[in-house]
Amino acid sequence: MPGFRRVERLPRQLLGISAFEGDVCPTRVRLFARGSASRTLPFPHPWNYRQPIRILESYFCGADAEQGWGRHNRYLEIPGFSPIFVTRDPRIIRAIATETGDRPGQFDRDALPSGGIARATGTDTLLYANGPMWKRQKKLSTPPFGRTTLFQPEQFHEFAETFRRTVRQRLAALEQRLGREGSPVRVRLEPEIKAIMLEMLANNFFGAQISYQQIRDRYVPALDRVIEFIVIDTVINKLGIPLRRLPSFSRWIAEAKDAHAAFDQLTDLTLATRSAGRGLWKQFKSDAPDRALRSNIKVFLAGALEATTSYASWAISHLSRNASAQDKVFHEVKDIDDYTPENLASAKYLNRALDETLRLTPSLYFFPRRATADTWVETTDGNRLWMPKGTHVLLDVWHANRHEDHWGVAVTGYPALDFVPERWENVTAHDRGTKDLLHFGFGHGPRFCPGKHLGQLEVGLVVGAFVKLFRFKAVNRECQVRAGVSTKPADGVLVELELRERSFAESTAATAPRELNGL
């Protein structure tokens, strides 16, 4: 908040007068409230930053006892600071997301929660930039991600072949474990999913030629460490000191530097294929030098890997706890031998299961925005909210998607907290299409995720093929959420796994290398 506005707002803040006006009246959240049932303070600090979902929950402590707009819209205001507005109301989320862009008076993406990402990748990125710079980055970076590019049969076939090759290798490893331990085998799938996703990103999308062993043993662990450092750096590094300037006085800093070096090497390998026009570089029409693209490539590698791993991990986790849904997906995909765009689109129950995954457990649990001017926000039903310039906005899609008011029995026919792909059939039957019920899984409005179609392609391939090959059941009855940059199942997708058709597995594994040590 600039100096004059800071002083101007101070009397109202001290008197507890709301900064917001209009039909939508958010309820104030007290920083410290006697008798509060909240389990943490409503902002990240060194003792709660690993629990961001709980931080968002703290804004809505006791909110379900309210009626009116304050039930789903809250704000925190501390004298001397800009207000923080948090909403789990889909109407407000949609309105603000729609009005996020580069035009005067529109919302920016709030850079405050992304400081660690910017220090790790660069500020000149589609993720971090705002205004005209964001518009330039969008024009430069997004063409290869379009549906018309990714869903061409030739490109789709390349992704399918990579996955098929990887599955053959993993089947060989599984056969070894089955021989040693019998069936079923207990497996933590998240590391395997992450390696498969990174292989498709690096080798198919960018046309690199990196061995699966290198991806799994070097680059995936390095990116995990980079992501972990980004989260910690965002909360703790208030001075914005780059990692390269920190002395390696601890093992943690030294390991973080090694991980960033591996990340740089992976970025080099993906950029090296540009001159040859391999992968989707052939769709990239720009004279920009490699150094101008480097930051966006790093954001893409880390961000797309996080998002697609989260998406696929949650889908498999949900299906592992819902045998009926898993069987329905299997009967739909069991006869698919060639993964074409048409075949994936025809797998309607699989696609409903994926939509339900994004609703119940979105990869990105909130979207940060900031008001660039005093502004009115108007919902599709005509209600209005005025907020002052500088307001920090958190669009809390995690709790919006899981609330009974928005997705419960009265609206969709099923409880909001249950994983029910049939929910989407019910929605369609009652003429409530995607314009009325949005899961915001890829964001919304001008700043929606440019990797949406890539995510749909990769996760559709992985989940469809996985269900076709394996029968799996969760080890733990319930699964909590683990959240950092994205959300993931806290148990790492721990399942008991067995092959559906041993004869098929044996014939497939017979042609695969057997030097891998197991899942």
Task: Put a short name on every predicted segment.
Residues 109-113, 153-312, 333:
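Cytochrome P450 heme-thiolate monooxygenase catalytic core
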Residues 1-123, 128, 132-136, 162-169, ...:
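N-terminal membrane-proximal hinge/A-helix region immediately C-terminal to the signal-anchor transmembrane segment
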Residues 357, 390, 419, 445, ...:
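Hydrophobic, well-ordered secondary-structure elements that form the walls
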Residues 47-70, 339-381:
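Conserved cytochrome P450 K-helix E-x-x-R motif and the immediately C-terminal K′/meander segment
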Residues 323-326, 444, 448, 452-489, ...:
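Cytochrome P450 heme-binding "Cys pocket" and the immediately downstream C-terminal segment
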Residues 395-430, 513:
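Conserved cytochrome P450 K-helix/beta-meander segment immediately N-terminal to the heme-binding cysteine loop
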Residues 248-252, 350, 355-369, 491-519:
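C-terminal domain-closing interface element
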